[in-house]
Curated annotation (Swiss-Prot):
Residues 404-482 form the Rhodanese domain. It is an enzyme of class 2 (transferase). This is tRNA sulfurtransferase. It catalyses: [ThiI sulfur-carrier protein]-S-sulfanyl-L-cysteine + a uridine in tRNA + 2 reduced [2Fe-2S]-[ferredoxin] + ATP + H(+) = [ThiI sulfur-carrier protein]-L-cysteine + a 4-thiouridine in tRNA + 2 oxidized [2Fe-2S]-[ferredoxin] + AMP + diphosphate; [ThiS sulfur-carrier protein]-C-terminal Gly-Gly-AMP + S-sulfanyl-L-cysteinyl-[cysteine desulfurase] + AH2 = [ThiS sulfur-carrier protein]-C-terminal-Gly-aminoethanethioate + L-cysteinyl-[cysteine desulfurase] + A + AMP + 2 H(+). Disulfide bonds join 344-456. HAMAP family: ThiI (MF_00021).
């Protein structure tokens, strides 16, 4: 099996040295991601494309799907690489490959050619197109907007029969730009903004300010792990959790009601800047959009930025909520965001939309900054790859079982698409499907006389959700790992 990786167009217009560096980094990223599927897989870089060759046909769909989610790839061609002798041989191979696909359809042939040959690309298009038209009675040629375009590539004595084209996410390869720290809350905005910076070539680390206890952190860990695993797993990143409840308590006690929102954001930027400086990160990323809430007016954003020298990136600054939600749906974080527990310890009855710097600074003079220093010092820093392991260590009260008893039911908490692609069937026990994002609202409707064994493919989500349900008072849950 062979895939041809086509580069994002912005890479191809770089200078020779920069283009070569980007291609080298992208090649390494592809190897890092795909080695989990096939250790014998070969990734070979060229000036115009990257080849991926693998032997394990069972991993074809998984490899193809993974490639479409690696930043820097414009599209992927799944090809069959065969030798040929002459133009008629090319036609015969094309006929065998595309006959069924062209039945009753309009088509055209498009050929790309590299190397020295006795024919041109146009001559191959005419010869193959004419032959297909003669040998497939129900098909007819249509050069503009055909039903099917037959793509062929001729390189020296090899013919590439294009079996399928699949769009990538584009952007720059991760690692071509410097690291950033995303202030992630688990909602729509922060997830999308994190994705946008990954797509632009940044390694995105995550900083979470916990205002609402373990359940909130569990949910945010899920979002961060999902984003990393889906779009950024070629690189190691950090997940930093800061317990911000003491800071919120100090704000509630010492700060005027109308200034609370801006002061809280300033404290978050101060804390995140300290974390960024500690790890050599160049910029912060937030999901703020202009005018979305009271703290996101230009005046207030300027005051928030003033507390730190660290660059703050806001990729969603001009986006409306509908656009952001649509992007969240495309990248798969919508369901997380919709069910994310919302905690706001600082709720102003009449928040200011045009804060005055002198007044904000006067309010902050009452704040005990040693509290802020302490929570940053005690921040929990985790390699995002270890989230599963740490969850297992932390959730000692959630039992993990490999077997089942007469009163047990397996609860498949994967997404609907994953369940449809690979249904779970276990002999001797009932299996019930309930996607993870519906557990908070639907688990209570299940038969509570049963013991529910939560299952997902990697075991991360099942343990996190089991802890969440335990915290909600459900004692009849365990994690299932056969």
């Amino acid at each position: 099996m062979k895939f041809i990786i086509k580069l994002f167009p912005e890479i191809t217009i770089k200078s020779q040295s920069v283009r070569l560096r980007f291609i080298k980094i992208l090649t390494g990223n592809i190897r890092n991601v795909l080695k989990h599927y096939d250790e014998t897989l070969a990734v070979v870089r060229h000036w115009d494309n990257i080849e991926v060759r693998a032997k394990d046909e069972n991993q074809r769909l998984a490899i193809r799907d993974a490639l479409t989610r690696i930043p820097g790839i414009h599209h992927i061609l799944e090809v069959e690489d065969v030798p040929f002798t002459d133009m008629h041989d090319i036609f015969e191979k094309a006929l065998a490959q595309y006959r069924e696909q062209l039945e009753g359809k309009t088509f055209c042939v498009r050929v790309k050619r590299r190397g020295k040959h006795e024919f041109s690309s146009i001559e191959v298009e005419r010869y193959v197109g004419g032959g297909l038209n003669q040998h497939i009675e129900s098909a007819r040629v249509k050069l503009t907007n055909p039903d099917v375009t037959v793509h062929l590539e001729v390189e020296d004595d090899r013919l590439l029969l294009i079996k399928g084209r699949y769009e990538g996410i584009g952007g720059f390869p991760i690692g071509t730009q410097e690291d950033v720290l995303s202030l992630i809350s688990g909602g729509f905005d922060s997830g999308v903004s994190s994705y946008m910076l990954m797509r632009r070539g940044c390694r995105v680390h995550y900083c979470f300010f916990n205002l609402g206890g373990a359940a909130h952190e569990i949910g945010v860990r899920q979002v961060a792990h999902y984003l990393w695993n889906r779009f950024g797993s070629s690189h190691r990143v950090r997940f930093v959790a800061i317990n911000f409840e003491p800071v919120v308590g100090e704000i509630l006690e010492k700060v005027d009601d109308g200034q609370m929102g801006v002061v809280l954001k300033r404290m978050m930027v101060r804390a995140a800047s300290k974390v960024a400086e500690r790890y050599g990160v160049q910029a912060l990323v937030t999901g703020e959009a202009l005018g979305q809430v009271s703290s996101q007016t230009l005046t207030n954003l300027r005051l928030i930025d003033n507390v730190s020298d660290t660059l703050i990136l806001r990729p969603l600054i001009s986006y409306d909520k509908e656009h952001i939600i649509n992007l969240a749906r495309q990248i798969g974080t919508e369901d997380f965001a919709r069910t994310m527990p919302e905690y706001c310890g600082v709720i102003s009855k009449s928040p200011t939309v045009k804060a005055i710097k002198a007044k904000i600074e006067a309010e902050e003079e009452n704040f005990d900054f040693s509290i802020l220093d302490k929570v940053v010092e005690e921040a929990n820093n985790v390699d995002i790859r270890e989230i599963a392991q740490q969850t297992q260590q932390e959730v000692v009260e959630v039992e993990t079982v490999s077997g089942f008893g007469p009163n047990d039911v397996i609860l498949d908490i994967r997404s609907v698409d994953e369940q449809d692609d690979k249904p779970l069937k276990v002999e001797g026990v009932d299996v019930v499907s309930l996607p993870f994002y519906k557990l908070s609202t639907k688990f209570g409707d299940l038969d509570q006389s049963k013991t529910w064994l939560l299952w997902c493919e990697r075991g991360v989500m099942s343990r996190l959700q089991a802890l969440y349900l335990r915290e909600q008072g459900f004692e009849n849950v365990k994690a299932y790992r056969p």
